[in-house]
Amino acid sequence: MNPSTAQATAVVDELVRGGVREVVLCPGSRNAPLAFALQAADLDGRLRLHMRIDERTAGFLALGLAIAGKRPVPIVMTSGTAVANLGPAVLEANYARVPLVVLSANRPYEMLGTGANQTVEQLGLFGSQVRATISLGLAEDDSTQNSQWRSAVCRVLAAARGTRSGNAGPVHFDIPLREPLVPDVHVHGPVPEGRPGGAAWTTTQNATLDVPVDLDLTADTVVISGHGSALRPELAGLPTVAEPTAPMHGIALHPLALSQLKPKQAIITGRPTLHRQVSKVLADPSVDVYALTTGPRWPDVSGNVLATGTRAVVTGTPDPAWIARCAALTEHAETAVRKQLDAHPKATGLHVAAAVMDALADGDQLLLGASNPVRDAALVSYPKPAVRVLSNRGVAGIDGTVSAAVGAALAYEGGRTVALMGDLTFLHDASGLLIGTGEPRPSDLTIVVANDDGGGIFELLEQGDPQYAGVFERVFGTPHGMDLAALCAAYRVPHAAVTVDALATTLAQPANGIRVLEVATDRSGLRELHASVRAQL
């Protein structure tokens, strides 16, 4: 076989040997050798291939597949702007530590700077946002290159998984390909072989880091369980403010209850991304703050952390009076939220979040959009223990949420997937609904859109203060007036407009593929609703 075909065949084979099971491919000419090899592997049942025409959407599809499947997922594209469109997904994968592999085809490097069409300096395009930038040299008619190709693939996967660094994340794998870009009509020459028995060319053991931190639990302690945290059994029994995507280590502590407490000690696990009340506690110089994290990132936004480590060595027991007070304040906060929801005259995103959280069953997978939905979910209730919760909290952008939900649903075989997002988030990534004929489709994905015709989160921020009412609606509210039913019809995705009261009943019915449930909400009273909740505390 010709050199480019041989190289692509070896790369795809080694990806499969290294544990890759899902690959997203965008059509192009320069990446044709990879496309042929991927299609062959898909037909052989060695991996599942997903075709997408938009690289930005494809990147977030791969992100969702990687998060839910807990495996590296390559996204393969041609050269030029196709690679640049992966920027947002790479940023999210970097800060969320998701093993995304950007596998870009390139022109032969001698074409750079010559004015050759669709040729850009794409090597190094992602800079510090990737764990590694790895390039293969041009393939030659030389069988000894097989070991170099396969070794490079193993290096890519190790960097993406963080097996040597403890820091998983995106990797840019760039492959220059010379013509011919299609397989020979009459195959000749040896097929590049891998290790016997389907083994990876190079195996890498996970690096381990054990840094104990001594903690005395007799002090009044709260735990802040942030995104990316692992379960910490040593913290069981402690009041815990857990983000929806994070494990509940101990006794649930409502985030609004923090304003009524004066803890002496706070323990961070993972990376907190929500709640101003949490930020205030962690920045309070009278609170001793400790951080339990893995990976190289510094886990201290406020500069107030006393010590960091990977696990706690605990002594002492919590004061029962402190535990009882935290439990009582949590119950009071939960009651206040639900009471004010019942009293509020109009449906809001908070009402939709409450209906969704209440309707979830064991085995469900929930994907929460950024902006208000993830915050609303945190305020109304903590997810049931057997519900799997995902969200793009790396850089907490709204982009790519529909595509990530599709990817997460495709990778999850344990039950149904429900995605909750706002209307701007849905519109921003509506092209994520475009799935080609014959492509793998989720079997049970419901996208719930809380449609308040604009940016509801700004109603709750400083910009939403009545003194700025004259400019607020156009530049922050951003009403769009879009017909979501017509938009869904264009993508041939079933759509239904439902009320908050009917949402639970509708969610109980199977999606039978992908469906969109639109709930009309009002954002004009959001500021008043949240103020009324706080007034009850």
Curated annotation (Swiss-Prot):
- Tell me the cofactors it needs: Mg(2+); Mn(2+); thiamine diphosphate
Quote the EC number.
2.2.1.9
Any one Pfam family here would be TPP_enzyme_N
Alphabetical keyword list: Magnesium, Manganese, Menaquinone biosynthesis, Metal-binding, Thiamine pyrophosphate, Transferase
User: What's an example GO BP annotation here?
Assistant: menaquinone biosynthetic process
Gene3D superfamilies assigned: 3.40.50.970
Q: How is the cofactor bound?
A: Binds 1 thiamine pyrophosphate per subunit.
The record's top EC class is transferase
- Could you state a single Gene Ontology molecular function term? thiamine pyrophosphate binding
- Metal-binding among keywords: yes
Q: Which reaction does it catalyse?
A: isochorismate + 2-oxoglutarate + H(+) = 5-enolpyruvoyl-6-hydroxy-2-succinyl-cyclohex-3-ene-1-carboxylate + CO2
InterPro entries from the UniProt entry: MenaQ_synth_MenD (IPR004433), THDP-binding (IPR029061), Thiamin_PyroP_enz_TPP-bd_dom (IPR012001), TPP_enzyme_TPP-bd (IPR011766)
The pathway entry for this protein reads as: Quinol/quinone metabolism; 1,4-dihydroxy-2-naphthoate biosynthesis; 1,4-dihydroxy-2-naphthoate from chorismate: step 2/7; Quinol/quinone metabolism; menaquinone biosynthesis
Q: Member of which family?
A: Belongs to the TPP enzyme family. MenD subfamily.
Tell me the subunit arrangement: Homodimer.
What HAMAP family does this protein map onto?
MenD (MF_01659)
What the protein does comes down to: Catalyzes the thiamine diphosphate-dependent decarboxylation of 2-oxoglutarate and the subsequent addition of the resulting succinic semialdehyde-thiamine pyrophosphate anion to isochorismate to yield 2-succinyl-5-enolpyruvyl-6-hydroxy-3-cyclohexene-1-carboxylate (SEPHCHC).
> What PANTHER family does this protein's entry cite?
2-SUCCINYL-5-ENOLPYRUVYL-6-HYDROXY-3-CYCLOHEXENE-1-CARBOXYLATE SYNTHASE, PROTEIN PHYLLO, CHLOROPLASTIC
Name of the molecule in the record: 2-succinyl-5-enolpyruvyl-6-hydroxy-3-cyclohexene-1-carboxylate synthase
According to its UniProt entry, this protein's organism is Rhodococcus erythropolis (strain PR4 / NBRC 100887)
